[in-house]
Amino acid sequence: ISYQQQRDAAEAVVADVQTAGTRALAVQADVGDEAEVLALFGAADAQFGRLDALVNNAGVVDRAQTVAEMSVQRLERMFRVNTIGSFICAREAVRRMSTRHGGRGGAIVNVSSIASRLGAPGQYVDYAAAKGALDVMTLGLAKEVAAQGIRVNAVRPGLIETDIHASGGQPDRVERLAPNVPMQRGGRAEEVADAILWLMSDGSHYTTGSLVDISGGNL
């Protein structure tokens, strides 16, 4: 379990996993920094010995702005974490899981966003574009490694109750926009996790290259 800032939250997840009777490890890492990603995977190698699955869940958003207002620094951060970081992590996972590299196969699940197809105009076009790139990576990598025993899919959450809205300066965003969702509510993180678990499980062993929307019908 990697984290950048919320150590207590990461350690709480580790505790939950251990209570359930299995092992877990929390490692601080910035997924946009290659050296830190290499250290993260090295720690996992030392602790667990092999890799079976990767969930690319790291993501950032910024304050709502139009493209005309965005700085290069903001754009670089958005793509470094949301896109490049996922590429680096996927690369390291493939090197460990691919049957071509002596691995046993596995699954990669990228956490994208329905913003990738809606565009998020007037708010987060940069975030939407970074997630759109993640969608394309999902499709291309799925085809690239399918014969190597690795499945690659993505979930695209919609309006979900998480802290990311507060970090973007809109802590009330879910409550405010929920009436626009066909199901008339925001989603829960657990509902996204359920889809991720299915995509990592043997129940989806013939599914790869899929983009699964978890959006309450927000099309």
Model-predicted regions and their roles:
Residues 39-46, 65-69, 73-80, 176:
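Active-site Tyr-X3-Lys motif and surrounding loop/helix of classical short-chain dehydrogenase/reductase
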Residues 61-64, 118, 196-197, 208-219:
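Short C-terminal tail/terminal secondary-structure segment
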Residues 68-87, 109, 134, 183:
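Catalytic Tyr-X3-Lys loop
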